[in-house]
């Protein structure tokens, strides 16, 4: 599907020539996804399974709200923050640090990748996605996810000097 809209996500300093998306109106009431709550539930022995389950459901609900809102209002432009696609990448980085290399940990990362892939697939229905990265981007654990998304032709990767 050819599209004329482009979303550029800056994971590095945006060039002075880039016109970054700014909208205090839509960002003021923007829900914030706190991945720390899930981290605390997993690491706190006092946290019960229902609290953990509630935190997961809250994360999912906030993601769905933001995906819809950003698909409508932020399906074009250059961003360095305040976009659900950044939230997805932050979730990935958080979970990679949280889990170990056990079968459980591998499953968590796999499900996380599937969830994030679906979000990027949804956005590619209306927009081309380019992720601008620094020269040393492959030193970051996020590079695994970015390469995965690139191999699926969901994103373009642009190295910014």
UniProtKB/Swiss-Prot annotation:
InterPro entries in alphabetical order: AcMNPV_P18 (IPR007773)
Pfam families in the cross-refs: AcMNPV_P18
Taxonomy, superkingdom: Viruses
The name this protein goes by in its record: P18 protein
Organism expressing this protein natively: Autographa californica nuclear polyhedrosis virus
């Amino acid at each position: 599907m050819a599209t004329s809209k482009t979303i550029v996500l800056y994971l590095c300093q945006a060039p002075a020539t880039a016109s970054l998306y700014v909208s205090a109106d839509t960002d003021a009431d923007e829900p914030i996804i706190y991945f720390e709550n899930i981290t605390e539930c997993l690491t706190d022995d006092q946290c019960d399974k229902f609290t953990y389950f509630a935190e997961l459901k809250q994360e999912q609900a906030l993601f769905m709200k933001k995906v819809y809102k950003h698909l409508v209002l932020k399906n074009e432009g250059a961003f360095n923050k305040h976009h659900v696609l950044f939230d997805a990448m932050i979730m990935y980085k958080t979970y990679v640090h949280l889990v170990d290399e056990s079968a459980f940990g591998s499953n968590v990362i796999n499900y996380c990748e599937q969830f994030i892939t679906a979000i990027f697939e949804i956005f590619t229905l209306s927009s081309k996605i380019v992720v601008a990265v620094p020269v040393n981007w492959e030193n970051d654990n996020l590079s695994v996810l970015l390469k995965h998304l690139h191999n699926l032709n969901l994103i373009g990767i642009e190295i910014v000097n």
